[in-house]
């Protein structure tokens, strides 16, 4: 039996993690976010009602679940308050269900200003960030000048630290990027107005998780973005600024690494990517447009149209290696309904003619890669909302089996629609 279950994306994000976390938290006591920030966009559909979460864990809608934001998350006070208000307006008692690590770095206005100034300065070489200050906040953390939630307990000292760090960043904004400085007093006033709310939710997350482990409580760790956007293992530099992989669970929450019992990789039945960066199987034809429209592939956070393409088993195998995946959850299978044929990338042809079955590590090495496809028959029958494996067309079952063969990982859950009920659980991670 697995008490500590990790749910993470195996591609470039947007795989459908939020729905699966929400579904599996029916048995969980805690749900923990351990990396990223409000650049995530987790969409939940429950009884036809849609909820989009960016910062708060997807367990927040469950009455008996405590949601935790761990130290690996960069926290925007403004974004958190906005999200809390939206949920509280719907009658969800967020403050009774949400806890924070005091070690969470804060995202403040100057981080957002830096993020946008840098993207503008890069011009055609822009990374395609969400412009929400995620990267600059992580930079401050690593440089040991960042302000954290715990600093809000001493407001006078916080004000001094804030002034020092803002002088540093405003110098860059004005003299290098040639944009306006961020107003110190406004930033201070905005944070002080909600400081007591934030500190009232602080808890020692590592100790809480250790006590939960000793009691045998079920804990779900919710990843954001996807493996191929990991700062170390992704398509660098077109990556996010955190460790999106299973290794980030221990460092981003304080759970001992030996205590992760099961890692569930969410894999979309095709591939998508937002923003710039390598994408070998990207489609620019009618099929790519079909996938975009059928899958409603527009970012929950930015609203940007996602790039679409065939499933890339080479890239997914890298995710299998890095995360030591226990099983897959296959999502958006229904989006492929109606296609005469479906393709899976099984290898890459390099510019020098070599065929390889592993992904390059450097972004420049992705240049000129051609995907080598295996083509399979599609299916005309609808898989939307199917809740039993026996109700799937044979061609869809063959597609599922081939994914398992190419990756060496079993598909334990199949999602056939956005609602939490439109799911087949073949093996429950908490029982694995």
Curated annotation (Swiss-Prot):
Mg(2+) binds at residues 14, 41. GO terms for cellular component: cytoplasm. Plays an important role in the de novo pathway of purine nucleotide biosynthesis. Catalyzes the first committed step in the biosynthesis of AMP from IMP. It catalyses: IMP + L-aspartate + GTP = N(6)-(1,2-dicarboxyethyl)-AMP + GDP + phosphate + 2 H(+). Its cofactor is Mg(2+). The gene is purA. Pathway: Purine metabolism; AMP biosynthesis via de novo pathway; AMP from IMP: step 1/2. The active site is at residues 14, 42. This is Adenylosuccinate synthetase.
